[in-house]
Amino acid sequence: MGKLCCGAVAFALLSVGLGSVQAQNYLTGSVAGPNGPEAGVWVIAETKDLPTRFARIVVTDDEGRYLVPDLPRAEYDVWVRGYGLVDSPKVKATVIPAPAGTGMTLDLAAVPAPSEKEAAQYYPAMYWFSLMHVPDESEFPLGKMSSQSEWLHTVKQGGCQSCHALGTPGTRAIPDMFRKGGEVDSFNAWKERVTAGSSRAAMARDMARLGEPGLRAFAQWTDAIEKGALPFARPERPKGAARNLVVTVWDWSQSTYYLQDLVATDRRDPRVNANGRVFGSAEMSTDLVPILDPKANSTSAVVHPVRDPRTPSTRSDPFGPS
């Protein structure tokens, strides 16, 4: 859970209240900082002891209390994350089979962020993405873009952001392989970056629609962040019903592939495949279909079936270094 990655799948469920705990093998306790209880922060319990990496995440209440329910038997790293904080040191906790209604009490210390810059590293990607300059309506038509709304649609739902979470650490900085040790400016680094990977044709197509003004916008965005620009707004901590969520995250697939989508049921009848396996779509990154068994906390993969064995694979398409 050090980073948010493509090779993970998460489920969110409503938890029971802290006053009616009947869970087995749970962690409970409170989170406090220098000024007292920390409300609305996340407590993360993560392990690599299971067949695949597993993490369960909950939110503290007004008094800083938390409960992580129904943990599989394993040794866990437990820590605190929250807006206005930096990650606390990880504490070890071992969960073993126990009678129903028993668990471990573990009080945790929150660590305030020493600066706005360090606090902002934990903000949602959108807060960083909001630093991108959007051309004013008066500047349109601009290249192939007839209006500001068309420009925004291309950057968001119709293009870039339909696949990428713009504003994540991986997108708000340019990897050195494209900067070549500073020899390439940001404009040309972005020009090369959008021709990388297995989706190079689609990315280059969308950037061509934005034209040079689009490339300049992306270059100026990452330049500003590199020079120290920070999001102009601070996210609020979870409140109300949002504090009742229990989020479970598993790793699946491989770090060299990316996941575009997944299916767990039929949206017309969500009772279909209850507690069953989850199937992923790796789009053009691999011919393997990742599979998660959330009951066994295990993963597997199958080669994507095709009707005609001569069907070409996108793995044979031109592939830009990435």
Model-assigned labels for residue ranges:
Residues 157-168, 218:
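The canonical Cys-X-X-Cys-His
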Residues 273-275, 279-321:
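Beta-propeller domains
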Residues 38, 67-75, 83:
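Short Pro-Gly-centered beta-turn/loop motif in secreted/extracellular proteins
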Residues 255-274, 316-322:
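Structural signature of eukaryotic scaffold interfaces centered on beta-propeller domains
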Residues 48-67:
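Short, acidic Ser/Thr/Gly-rich low-complexity loop/linker segments typical of extracellular
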Residues 33-49, 73, 126-140:
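Short, ordered, surface-exposed loop/turn motifs in non-cytosolic proteins
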Residues 47-53, 75, 79-96:
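A short, solvent-exposed loop/turn motif at the edges and junctions
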Residues 24, 96-121:
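Extracellular beta-sheet/turn segments enriched in Thr/Pro/Gly and aliphatic residues
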